[in-house]
């Protein structure tokens, strides 16, 4: 028997079947670095329209976690897809390098500044520590396959950036947005510093809940207001609070102007409460026998005075919109030094912003004899005992509630009035302008807009000063007596900025005021405060984007971070940009959800459900991690687990196998010589290229909409359904058995070439390593890297006017599916082995029959059977299978007649009819020794 194997065009490629990504990717990265791939891309894109995604700086502390990976991969997918869409899209990664977490790390190792080290040495240690953290994180980010200017990132501790942060503050001062005041700020007694809103987390805490009576100073005036004369005992207004320790700072009682307030007689005294809360308060304080003597509107009680239960003064009743009927008594204890609402209403009524608490959380001397020097969280019991002793305590109980805590220490924080510097939301219209700017930004997902609008509408002034060592100095001089800013503040700040640009922030602390103030130096003091780190990162649109040459003066098109950044970086950037320039710093803002485990639980080391990106890359490879990120809907929580990553690896294999099939069957194809013109191609091949064209339209739309899970789904559908289970199956016969240089085979290779050229580019933003690998095996002249080019433009499709148009092949796909069902059943019944052992008869109604008949003898190649005939639907025998999908189709199957050809494996009746080739069929004889078979349709 002759060996006909050598006459077949068997697939062959050096592109490996197994990805082995964990082993192969580092080598590719080394090549990208050695070649300066990022530089090559920049050179290739020079002069094109720009798209600037500005990197929100991660904090330079600790190893990267899965959330970091999600963030950087999403950014990289966008940058690469924009590059392929014809944009010059530089990517400059950044790091946030100042602030408390770094100070704490350095403190742990070396002690606090001023103990063993000077503050200057401490700052140097902080700078050193941040630099090592940046290096560690940078290696991991690069390993993810993220392309960027990694050798020239921006760091908020770069001298030039530090100087530009000072300049940003100068611009805000020049525009009139800065003011100084004693205001209640979030204060951590462990950090001994004010905290930004974004540094506050909420945890459940058990606190005492108390009802306290403030006796009226003028009892008769109250009787008159309520229209009563007979009251048994003193009259009091009752407040409710869960922070007894703040009572020494009480300066008023807030009530709502429009609520009804009742005067309620209880045993031996009368109390004033919101009428709607009388029943719940009576239940709480254990009183069943009470009488409502009268009611008035809250507005009637304004400015009546009540005696503080244990301090030696009385306080007014004032009107506030923040009073609710959700809980309590309808009368709110008001301490302007310990709460933002209290502060706002206190300003309105000219109340003292009293703050009897020191930075360490203990009462200052002279507060109250039994409280001086006591920690406020230990003072609740003392205050409650005092109230009891004075007969002012109506009720006490424990309650659990959500309480603000320091993100770093996880300990409860307090509101504490301290002298601080603020960016005012309203003194120069910053709030109104910011709300206007928000409307001009595209928020993705769109609920982000309402979220940030409500945050901006309700946020207090931004406290930008911190009492820290490692941070950008505010660089201000204030008058010793008046505490007013120096009249030449902007000029002086520029002078400081120039010095910082040369020597870093230490230049401020080394600066002798005389050097720039001359004779005035004795009248002014240097402000020792540093800037909130959110000011550092929030000003990068100015300190980085405006000055980096690769951005060429363009503003950022996009900011992309986790959804917690509405109150963090998106907010601080919006505030600073609007205060400086009157406009938002971004055109689009995209947010992604947090990572959770397979069961939807938050990642936590204590539960042991964290997924380390380093482990994933070392086991499965970065491309699997990238595919998981892209295939997950980032608008909600992003679930990740070993099982989910395994599914991503399965999807990856399907894509890789498709790419490998294309490459293996392009063996021996030279596009410069072997390409077949579209009009001369086999119809099915043109259909396949048309499928790629339709897929490309969908994929490009999805990339444009940042809808990456749609990109992956469409890519998978193309690989698995349109190619894998239809086209690639059908062409194997023609590809392997036709004459090597025949139009039938070259037509097929032409289609595969166009498809491969498109596919490798669709993959590139997501499966960057694999796309680079595929690119290296594609035939024909090309640039060195897929990333420097643009989407493939060589695709074409069938015209709708053609008889065998897309709709024709869509119907054929359905017919093929129905035939497969019948073959599967016959295989299960052991009537046939493979599909080539079968012959089918398709009983079809006239319209479908005409389409099937048009394919002639080539119908069998589409159905992967050795025989296929078409007959009238009404002639179908009883055992023919009715299609559920196509009502006008029945399928009957029989065993194929004739012998099996050892070369093409088809069963035919002309095997051995040609003496010189006695073992093979006539078609194979033609392909081996004759002119080769002609194919028109399939």
UniProtKB/Swiss-Prot annotation:
Cofactor note (record): Binds 1 zinc ion per subunit.
Cell compartment(s), UniProt: Cytoplasm
Keyword Metal-binding in annotation: yes
Sequence motif: 'HIGH' region, positions: 58-68
Short name of one Pfam family: zf-FPG_IleRS
Keywords: Acetylation, Aminoacyl-tRNA synthetase, ATP-binding, Cytoplasm, Ligase, Metal-binding, Nucleotide-binding, Protein biosynthesis, Zinc
Lineage: superkingdom: Bacteria
N6-acetyllysine: modified positions: 183
Residue numbers binding ATP: 605
GO cellular component: cytosol
GO BP term, pick one: isoleucyl-tRNA aminoacylation
Binding-site residues, Zn(2+): 901, 904, 921, 924
Subunit annotation: Monomer.
Written domain comment of the UniProt record: IleRS has two distinct active sites: one for aminoacylation and one for editing. The misactivated valine is translocated from the active site to the editing site, which sterically excludes the correctly activated isoleucine. The single editing site contains two valyl binding pockets, one specific for each substrate (Val-AMP or Val-tRNA(Ile)).
The protein's name: Isoleucine--tRNA ligase
Source organism (scientific name): Escherichia coli O6:K15:H31 (strain 536 / UPEC)
């Amino acid at each position: 028997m002759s060996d006909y194997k050598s006459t077949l065009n068997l697939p062959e490629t050096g592109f490996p079947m197994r990805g082995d990504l964990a082993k192969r990717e580092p080598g590719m990265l080394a090549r990208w670095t050695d070649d300066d791939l990022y530089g090559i891309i920049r050179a290739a894109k020079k002069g094109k329209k720009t798209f600037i995604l500005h990197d929100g700086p991660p904090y330079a502390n600790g190893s990267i976690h899965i959330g970091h990976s999600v963030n950087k991969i999403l950014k990289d997918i966008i940058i690469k897809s924009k590059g392929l869409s014809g944009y010059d899209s530089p990517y400059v990664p950044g790091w946030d390098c100042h602030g408390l977490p770094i100070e704490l790390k350095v403190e742990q190792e070396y002690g606090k500044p001023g103990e063993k080290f000077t503050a200057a040495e401490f700052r140097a240690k902080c700078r050193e520590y941040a630099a090592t953290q940046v290096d560690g994180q940078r290696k991991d980010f690069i390993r993810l396959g993220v392309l960027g200017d990694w050798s020239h990132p921006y760091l908020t501790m770069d001298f030039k950036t530090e100087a530009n942060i000072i300049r940003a503050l100068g611009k805000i001062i020049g525009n009139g947005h800065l003011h100084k005041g004693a205001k209640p700020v979030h204060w951590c007694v462990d950090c001994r510093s004010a905290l930004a809103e974004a540094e506050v987390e909420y945890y459940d805490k058990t606190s005492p809940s108390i009802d306290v009576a403030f006796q009226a100073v003028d009892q008769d005036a109250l009787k008159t207001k309520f229209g009563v004369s007979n009251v048994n005992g003193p009259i009091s207004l009752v407040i409710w609070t869960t922070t007894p320790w703040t009572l020494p700072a009480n300066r008023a009682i807030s009530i709502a102007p429009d609520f009804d307030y009742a005067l309620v007689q209880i045993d031996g005294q009368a109390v004033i409460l919101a009428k709607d809360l009388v029943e719940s308060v009576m239940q709480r304080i254990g009183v069943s026998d009470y009488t409502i003597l009268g009611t008035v509107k809250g507005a009637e009680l304004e400015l009546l005075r009540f005696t503080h239960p244990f301090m030696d003064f009385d306080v007014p009743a004032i009107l506030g919109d923040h009073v609710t009927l959700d809980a309590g008594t309808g009368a709110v204890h008001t301490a302007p030094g310990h709460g933002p609402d209290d502060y706002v209403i206190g300003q309105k009524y000219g109340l003292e912003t009293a703050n009897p608490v020191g930075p360490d959380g203990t009462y200052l001397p002279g507060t109250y004899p039994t409280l001086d020097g006591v920690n406020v969280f230990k003072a609740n019991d003392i205050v409650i005992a005092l109230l009891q002793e004075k007969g002012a305590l109506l009720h006490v109980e424990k309650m659990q509630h959500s309480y603000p805590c320091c993100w770093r220490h996880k300990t409860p924080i307090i509101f504490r009035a301290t002298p601080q510097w603020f960016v005012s939301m309203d003194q120069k219209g910053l709030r109104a302008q910011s709300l206007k700017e928000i409307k001009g930004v595209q928020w993705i997902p769109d609920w982000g807009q309402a979220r940030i609008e409500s945050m901006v509408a309700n946020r207090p002034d931004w406290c930008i000063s911190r009492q820290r060592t490692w941070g950008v100095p505010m660089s201000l001089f204030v008058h010793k007596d008046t505490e007013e800013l120096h009249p030449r503040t902007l000029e002086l700040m520029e002078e400081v900025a120039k010095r910082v640009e040369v020597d870093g922030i230490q230049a401020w602390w080394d600066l002798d005021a005389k050097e720039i103030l001359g004779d005035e130096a004795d009248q002014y003091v240097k402000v020792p405060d540093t800037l909130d780190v959110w000011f550092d990162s929030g000003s990068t649109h100015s300190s980085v984007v405006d000055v980096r040459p690769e951005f060429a003066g363009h503003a950022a098109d996009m900011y992309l971070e986790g959804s917690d950044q509405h109150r963090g970086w998106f907010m601080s950037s919006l505030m600073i940009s609007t205060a400086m320039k009157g406009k938002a710093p971004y055109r689009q803002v995209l947010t992604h959800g947090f990572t959770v485990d397979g069961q939807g639980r938050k990642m936590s080391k204590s539960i042991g459900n964290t997924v380390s990106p380093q482990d994933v890359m070392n086991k499965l490879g970065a491309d699997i991690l990238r595919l998981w990120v892209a295939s997950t809907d980032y608008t909600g929580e992003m679930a990740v687990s070993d099982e989910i990553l395994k599914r991503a690896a399965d999807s990856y294999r399907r894509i890789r196998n498709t790419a490998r099939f294309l490459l293996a069957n392009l063996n021996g194809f030279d596009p410069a010589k072997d390409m077949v013109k579209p009009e001369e191609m086999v119809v099915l091949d043109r259909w396949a290229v048309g499928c790629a064209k339709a897929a490309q339209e969908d994929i490009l739309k999805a990339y444009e909409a940042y809808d990456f899970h749609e990109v992956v789904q469409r890519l998978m559908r193309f690989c698995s359904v349109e190619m894998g289970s239809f086209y690639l199956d059908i062409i194997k016969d023609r590809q392997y058995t036709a004459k090597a240089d025949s139009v039938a085979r070259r037509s097929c290779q032409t289609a595969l070439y166009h498809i491969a050229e498109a596919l490798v580019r669709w993959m590139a933003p997501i499966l960057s390593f694999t796309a680079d690998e595929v690119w290296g095996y594609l035939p024909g002249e090309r640039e060195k890297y897929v990333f420097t080019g643009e989407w493939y433009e060589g695709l074409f499709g069938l015209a709708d006017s053609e008889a065998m148009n897309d709709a024709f092949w869509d119907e054929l796909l359905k017919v093929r599916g129905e035939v497969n069902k019948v073959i599967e059943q016959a295989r299960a019944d052991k009537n046939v082995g493979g599909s080539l052992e079968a012959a089918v008869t398709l009983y079809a109604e006239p319209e479908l029959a005409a389409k099937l008949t048009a394919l002639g003898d080539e119908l069998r190649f589409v159905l992967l059977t050795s025989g296929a005939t078409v007959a009238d639907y009404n002639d179908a025998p009883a055992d023919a299978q009715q299609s559920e999908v196509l009502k006008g189709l029945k399928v009957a199957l029989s065993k194929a007649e004739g012998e099996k050809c050892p070369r093409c494996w088809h069963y035919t009746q002309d095997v051995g009819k040609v003496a010189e080739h006695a073992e093979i069929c006539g078609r194979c004889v033609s392909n081996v020794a004759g002119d080769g078979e002609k194919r028109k349709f399939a």
